[in-house]
Curated annotation (Swiss-Prot):
Protein's organism: Pseudomonas syringae pv. syringae (strain B728a)
NCBIfam families: rsmG_gidB
GO molecular function ontology, one term from the record: rRNA (guanine-N7-)-methyltransferase activity
Name of this protein: Ribosomal RNA small subunit methyltransferase G
Membrane-traversing stretches: none
Length: 214
């Protein structure tokens, strides 16, 4: 384990995952901590996340990402505006049988993501350096997820072409974004909304699941 990742971090991850109802294998636990170590190391130079304190990263990044695990269905996912790789990298670690793509227009961030893919040997992870509106997938994704990426209007507008009526759009938010829902494009609707409790995180967390009507 990296010297930057402490036994307290390891314990917080184990306990938090259990509270979320997630049974991490020893290998997954180790991979998540290896990812955390890379995030701490690269964040100093690359500004991957505004969270500077490593002691806050387990709850605000790892456990926050794991909180959406019960809602992941289907085999092909894309994390849009992935930044430091949340929630896509934890998803790829948890679901080795699913394909997860990370999309970001920032070259520093995609370089970091590629390094994580190589070091953690995540064969199911694809890193895409592109703007959302420019990226053209060959087939629609089963799920499109974003974490604090943009407004719901922009998120759906920029990624509409990546999915179809069978796709689920998952938007990870803080407060329930009532004002953003009003501005949702007419061909999208709210399928369900879920208040999430993230161990160690203060403040509200919500997951909104959206679908296309046509």
């Amino acid at each position: 384990m990296s010297s930057m990742v402490t036994p307290q971090h390891a314990q917080e991850l184990s306990t938090g995952a259990r509270e979320l109802g997630i049974d991490l294998s020893p290998a997954q636990h180790e991979q998540l901590l290896a990812y955390l170590a890379l995030l701490i190391k690269w964040n100093k130079a690359y500004n991957l996340t505004a969270v500077r304190n490593p002691d806050e990263m387990v709850s605000r990044h790892l456990l926050d990402s794991l909180s959406v695990v019960p809602f992941i269905e289907g085999t092909r996912w894309i994390d849009v505006g992935s930044g430091g790789g949340m929630p896509g990298i934890p998803m790829a670690i948890l679901f080795p049988e699913r394909k997860v793509a990370l999309l970001d227009s920032n070259g520093k961030k995609t370089r970091f993501q590629t390094q994580v893919k190589l070091e953690l040997k995540l064969d199911n992870l694809e890193v895409i350096h592109s703007r959302a509106e420019s990226y053209q997938p060959e087939v629609p994704f089963d799920g499109i997820i974003s974490r604090a990426f943009s407004s719901l209007e922009d998120f759906t507008g920029w990624t509409r072409h990546m999915g179809d009526v069978n796709t689920r759009w998952l938007a990870m938010k803080g407060l329930h974004p009532d004002d953003e829902l009003v501005a949702l494009p007419s061909d999208f609707h709210l399928d369900s909304a879920h208040a999430l409790t993230v161990p160690g995180c203060q403040g509200q967390r919500h997951l909104l699941i959206l679908r296309r009507t046509a």
